[in-house]
A protein has these predicted regions:
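A detector for small-residue-rich transmembrane helices and their helix-helix packing motifs
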Residues: 1-212
Length: 212
C-alpha cells in the first residue's frame, strides 16, 4: 500500500516532468511524419556540414540548442517508452519535493553535461535519448535521500540497485552483444555527475525544500 503522498500525481501538477515527456513524444511523432534524417538534421548534437572535401559530423558550435536537444531523439519505440517511464518515475518525485524550477535545472544540467561527455566519449557520432537525464534525476534523488532525508519521496531501494547495476553492465559491452544496441555510457555518467552536482548545490542553497 502507498501512503497518499506516494501516489504519483496528475501530469498537470508536475509541469516540468510532463513537458520533458511531451517533447520526447512530439519529436518521436515528428520522426515518423517527417523522417528521422530531417529530425536529426535539426536536433542532433553533431550537425552534418560540408568541410570542403566531404560531408562530416561537426561539433555544435554556436547552434546552442544542440547541446540539449539530442535527449529528445530516440531510436525505436522501446527506447522512447522506457526512458519516458523512468523520467516519470524519478521526475515527479523531484518536482513534487523541490519544485518545477529545480527539476528543470537538473534536467538542463543532465542534458548538457550528458551530451557533452557522450561527445567526448564517442567522438563525432549520432546519439540521443533521455537516459542521461534519467541518471541525472536518479543521482539527485539518491544524494538527497542520504543528505536530506524527507525532502523528496524516495523510490524503492531496489530501483537504485538496478540503476547502478545497469550503469556498470553498460560498460562491459554485454548489452550491445545481446541486442540492446549501442549504449551511451558517456551520457549516463555525465548525467549522473550532473544530477549529483545539482543536488549538492540545491542542498547548499536551501535549508529546506520548497516550491520555486
Amino acid at each position: 500500500m502507498h501512503s497518499p503522498l506516494e501516489i504519483p500525481p496528475r501530469w498537470q501538477s508536475v509541469p516540468a516532468t510532463s513537458l520533458i515527456i511531451a517533447l520526447a513524444l512530439l519529436v518521436a511523432a515528428a520522426s515518423e511524419l517527417l523522417g528521422k534524417p530531417f529530425v536529426l538534421d535539426w536536433l542532433a548534437y553533431t550537425p552534418v556540414e560540408f568541410t570542403g572535401r566531404r560531408f562530416e559530423l561537426v561539433p555544435p558550435g554556436d547552434q546552442y540548442w544542440r547541446y540539449i536537444t539530442p535527449v529528445f531523439v530516440h531510436f525505436g519505440l522501446l527506447h522512447l517508452v522506457f526512458n519516458c517511464l523512468w523520467i516519470w518515475e524519478f521526475g515527479w518525485r523531484l518536482e513534487r519535493g523541490l519544485g518545477w524550477t529545480h527539476c528543470l535545472g537538473i534536467f538542463l544540467a543532465g542534458a548538457i553535461v550528458g551530451n557533452g561527455l557522450q561527445f567526448w566519449w564517442s567522438g563525432p557520432s549520432i546519439f540521443g535519448g533521455l537516459s542521461g537525464v534519467v541518471y541525472a534525476f536518479m543521482g539527485a534523488l539518491w544524494w538527497l535521500g542520504r543528505v536530506r532525508p524527507g525532502w523528496v519521496i524516495q523510490p524503492p531501494s531496489a530501483i537504485f540497485t538496478f540503476m547502478w547495476i545497469w550503469l556498470l553492465v553498460g560498460l562491459t559491452g554485454v548489452l550491445e552483444i545481446i541486442g540492446f544496441g549501442a549504449i551511451a555510457n558517456g551520457a549516463h555518467f555525465g548525467g549522473l555527475l550532473a544530477g549529483l552536482g545539482s543536488a549538492v548545490v540545491i542542498t547548499s542553497l536551501h535549508s529546506k525544500p520548497g516550491a520555486h
